Amino acid sequence: MKYIFAPPANKGLQQLNHALFESSHTLPALKIPAHASGIAMETLRSHILVAPRLRTIVDDPTDKKWRLLLLDPSMEASEINDLPNPLKEFALKHEAKLVKHTIELKYDYWTSDQVLRSILPDEMETPGAFETVGHIAHLNLRDRYQPFKHIIGQVILDKSSHIKTVVNKLDNIDHTFRFFQMEILAGINDMNAKLKEGGCFFHFDFSKVYWNSRLQGEHDRIIKLFGQNDLICDVFAGVGPFALPAAKHKRCVVFANDLNPQSFKYLMENIKLNKLETRILPFNMDGRQFIKQSLEDLNNPAIWNKITKQKPTSNDKKRNRKVESPTVAPLTDQPAISGIRHFKHYVMNLPATAIEFLDAFHGLYSGMRDVIMDSDLPTIHCHCFSNAKDVKADVIERVERVIGMPLGSNLIMVHSVRTVAPNKDMLCISFRLPSALAFAEPKILGKRKGLETEENLVSQSDVSKSSDNILEKDT
């Protein structure tokens, strides 16, 4: 049976002191010949000490020819004859002696959970799993943990070798640009995260953009729905968690947009970092207006050439030389497209408000019924939150209210992404754009203040220049 030691109780401690977590534990032990160690481990397993990160057999400090076999701490015996039969027989056969051995356990031995349990009041649970963003541990502590937040941060920093900075999310959130206000609890003041997800490298300032490592599974799920060389419109792209893997692994051409200038800055940098300039075109504009002009931009030769005129990157050349996988179709620099170009998928990952942007699809294909078939209409993946009892019905009803018509057979699925808080779920509704909505007479949607669409598009040559400037500023 595994034995778990516990550190000394330090209830209410708010400033970390390693010395307060030192403890001594005296255990029964058999002093055995060194050559009998292997036999002892094989035959006495049910009677010896089994504890995390502790050796069962240690050197005898008084004689190198002998070893100390540490026994189950719960065993009560003052002499050999008091031992259970297997131990007694082994001891008599090998002339072993029953002794006491003291082990010293210090702060470094205890896990973060053990340390925090010894500190926090009994009625408080230790904080659950935290999000890791590169070298940053991201906590979301509730109010009752506020008196202990700094010591919690220090313990996590001490016990996680890859963590250099521990931050706590504050209540304030920037609703326009979707990033959280944070405070540093422990470690260095460095919010520039570097990480790898979905086979792509990402770099960004975590304090200025939105990133959630817990959504990697959702990123992967959506990307698996894309086909090779699909045209993708990522309306709220952030720093590229959907756009980059889709371009790299599915060879999709992605129009990726984000309103946050900082997200846009790092999106451009990450495109260059992953050598995906021939696959992703970045935009920095309001999501509603981006949707409204997406089809026009896709069929604008000047805009399309921003990608097609790019020289193939080394990644493109390597991929095009590969013939090892018979399941992957031969790849060209760009998908061969005749007639009207149209996106296969729209991704709308802005859970708090994405549903409100669905009105932008009204009349998107107006006047194109002769050249666009119903089967060509895109699939929309719209992320949202719900705290309703029936979340699926709630999401469907909200979408139908915004688009002004029932989804009917156009509904594909409502996928449960994760529970973000008690009685609050994140979901993704996927549906085909209804033809009645797509081909309707367009509504006039006002542009949001400060939008100048000609300046919102950044060419890939500008991306390279901008990224170079970014790197210079960061050094």
UniProtKB/Swiss-Prot annotation:
The keyword Cytoplasm applies. S-adenosyl-L-methionine binds at H219, D258, L259, D286, G287, N349. The keyword S-adenosyl-L-methionine applies. Its EC number is 2.1.1.228. Residues 306-328, 456-475 are annotated as: Disordered. Monomer. It is an enzyme of class 2 (transferase). Specifically methylates the N1 position of guanosine-37 in various cytoplasmic and mitochondrial tRNAs. Methylation is not dependent on the nature of the nucleoside 5' of the target nucleoside. This is the first step in the biosynthesis of wybutosine (yW), a modified base adjacent to the anticodon of tRNAs and required for accurate decoding. One of its GO terms (cellular component) is cytoplasm. Keywords: Cytoplasm, Methyltransferase, Mitochondrion, Nucleus, S-adenosyl-L-methionine, Transferase, tRNA processing. Belongs to the class I-like SAM-binding methyltransferase superfamily. TRM5/TYW2 family. Gene3D superfamilies: Met-10+ protein-like domains (3.30.300.110), Vaccinia Virus protein VP39 (3.40.50.150). This is tRNA (guanine(37)-N(1))-methyltransferase. Its main location: mitochondrion. Residues 456-469 have a biased composition (Polar residues). It is found in: Mitochondrion matrix; Nucleus; Cytoplasm. It catalyses: guanosine(37) in tRNA + S-adenosyl-L-methionine = N(1)-methylguanosine(37) in tRNA + S-adenosyl-L-homocysteine + H(+). GO terms for molecular function: tRNA (guanine(37)-N1)-methyltransferase activity; tRNA methyltransferase activity. GO terms for biological process: tRNA N1-guanine methylation. Pfam families: TRM5-TYW2_MTfase, TYW2_N_2.
